[in-house]
């Protein structure tokens, strides 16, 4: 059934919208899970025999842009900076120095690609500013994610025994890697940490960038799927914790780093299953959005793609991340994606089924250049009918504030952090179900709170944390 016939059927009342927003979601879920099994190893599990680290393997949509590549996408300006000759000649960079200056390192990759089990990759760090050279060796343990971007493998540092994840991507020698440049700027408890990076070559003289990342043993996707398989809903405390940390990380990215992630989805949200600290990963699609400068609209995995992207907007804002965050929150509450479209247009149908037909003004806010307006008039489906009757009203309210057609009406990340839905987290007596203390939630830096009103600050930081500079 084409998009117009489907919308007309919904408008006429022939197609109902039940508590299963996707309608035939079970079939779509089965197809999705099969794609997961075929395209990528499952995200990391808690048990030691099956733990893995899922990154950019986009199993939700073949339409998603794998922006990790250094080759600029169509209509998006390339990163013009040329790589220094020393990098082309296989000198490597150490990202751990405080002043962001580059340090040369040499790398050796023994026979093979460096990703086979047991393969050892040796790099030499230091050798500048009077500091001695230090050899670091990583033993590849398993490939845990593949995609058009390259490969991610789990490795062990032989000197320290530390587990890391190494993301290996083909490097275009003409350009700097945008993902690397962005990750070098970041330092936040809810953003995956870049330990350092190095370059390696193959027998075909191909240059690869290797990002050495901290290892986090779970994903929100896997955690959610765990409860779905048991026919249970994720405990509300975990929905609160994960959503809050997503919003806090997005506030940091948007306001401090000045970056839009552009691919927020459960697979890109890492979680420590013991502490429940969340970290956003995979900055292969991330970009600093410049007002007036066009960007590609074919970005973000489909289920989490903001409507302005579907309408072809090229001058969008960080609000696309807030839409994606709202979709993730709704999915955790429902146990399934809220908008499970099977194509770009089908995605719009799923959104309209719940939000109703966008008004002309809403379409103008999403894309001023979009003039076509032929959609049947469909009324918005009440949010309280989408979720279970016992769902906290604060949860429903926050979802509704994030999933607005007009990007400028969506609450900002910092405003979301102050929402009453998270008041339970601000209770000094609250703890994790396992008895542990909550992960750091309120240790905001001055940069994170820059521009926030006194009232907002008071709502953000609970009384028992104010003036202490410490987190819960």
From Swiss-Prot:
ATP binds at residues 144-152, 167. Disulfide bonds: none annotated. The active site is at residue 263. It catalyses: L-seryl-[protein] + ATP = O-phospho-L-seryl-[protein] + ADP + H(+); L-threonyl-[protein] + ATP = O-phospho-L-threonyl-[protein] + ADP + H(+). Autophosphorylated mainly on threonine and serine residues. Its EC number is 2.7.11.1. The modification Phosphotyrosine is found at residue 298. Residues 138-423 form the Protein kinase domain. GO terms for cellular component: nucleus. Keywords: ATP-binding, Kinase, Nucleotide-binding, Phosphoprotein, Serine/threonine-protein kinase, Transferase. One of its GO terms (biological process) is protein autophosphorylation. Gene3D superfamilies: Phosphorylase Kinase, domain 1, Transferase(Phosphotransferase) domain 1. One of its GO terms (molecular function) is protein serine kinase activity. It is an enzyme of class 2 (transferase). It comes from the Eukaryota. It holds the Pfam family Pkinase. Belongs to the protein kinase superfamily. CMGC Ser/Thr protein kinase family. GSK-3 subfamily. May mediate extracellular signals to regulate transcription in differentiating cells. This is Shaggy-related protein kinase theta. It comes from Arabidopsis thaliana. The gene is ASK8.
């Amino acid at each position: 059934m084409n998009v117009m016939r489907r919308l007309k059927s919904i408008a006429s009342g022939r197609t109902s919208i039940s508590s299963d927003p996707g309608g035939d979601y079970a079939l779509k879920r089965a197809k999705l899970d099969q794609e997961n099994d075929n395209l990528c190893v499952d995200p990391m599990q808690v048990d030691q025999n099956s733990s893995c680290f899922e990154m950019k393997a986009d199993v939700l949509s073949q339409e998603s842009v794998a922006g990790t590549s250094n080759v600029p996408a169509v209509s998006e300006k390339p990163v013009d900076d040329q790589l220094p000759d020393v990098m082309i000649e296989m000198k490597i960079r150490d990202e751990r120095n405080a002043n962001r200056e580059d340090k040369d390192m040499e790398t050796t990759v023994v026979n093979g690609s460096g990703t086979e089990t047991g393969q050892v990759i040796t790099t030499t760090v230091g050798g500048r500013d009077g500091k001695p050279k230090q050899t670091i060796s990583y033993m590849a343990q398993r490939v845990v994610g593949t995609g058009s971007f390259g490969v991610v493998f789990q490795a062990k540092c032989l000197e320290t025994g530390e587990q890391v994840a190494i993301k290996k991507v083909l490097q275009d020698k003409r350009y700097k890697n945008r993902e690397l440049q962005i990750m070098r700027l970041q330092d936040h408890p809810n953003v995956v940490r870049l330990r350092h990076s190095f370059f390696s070559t193959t027998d075909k003289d191909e240059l690869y960038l290797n990002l050495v990342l901290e290892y986090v043993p779970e994903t929100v996707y896997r955690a959610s799927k765990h409860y779905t398989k048991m026919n249970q809903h994720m405990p509300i405390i975990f929905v609160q914790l994960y959503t809050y940390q997503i919003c806090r990380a997005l506030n940091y990215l948007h306001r401090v780093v000045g970056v839009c992630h552009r691919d927020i989805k459960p697979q890109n949200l890492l979680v420590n299953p013991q502490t429940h600290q969340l970290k956003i990963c995979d900055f292969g699609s991330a970009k600093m959005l410049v007002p007036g400068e066009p960007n590609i609209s074919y970005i973000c995995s489909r289920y989490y793609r903001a409507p302005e992207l579907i309408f072809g907007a090229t001058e969008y804002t960080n609000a696309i991340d807030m839409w994606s965050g709202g979709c993730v929150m709704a999915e955790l509450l429902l146990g399934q994606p809220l908008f499970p479209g099977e194509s770009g247009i089908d995605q719009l149908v799923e959104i309209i089924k719940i939000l109703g037909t966008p008004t002309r003004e809403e379409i103008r806010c999403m894309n001023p250049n979009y003039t076509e307006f032929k959609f049947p008039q469909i009324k918005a489906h009440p949010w309280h009918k989408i979720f279970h009757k016992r769902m906290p009203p604060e949860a429903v309210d926050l979802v509704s504030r994030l999933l607005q057609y007009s990007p400028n009406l969506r609450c900002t990340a910092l405003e979301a952090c102050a929402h009453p839905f998270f008041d339970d987290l601000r209770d000094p007596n609250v703890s994790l179900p396992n008895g542990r203390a909550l992960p750091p939630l309120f240790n905001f830096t001055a940069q994170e709170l820059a521009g926030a009103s006194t009232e907002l600050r008071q709502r953000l930081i609970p009384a028992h944390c104010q003036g202490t500079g410490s987190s819960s």
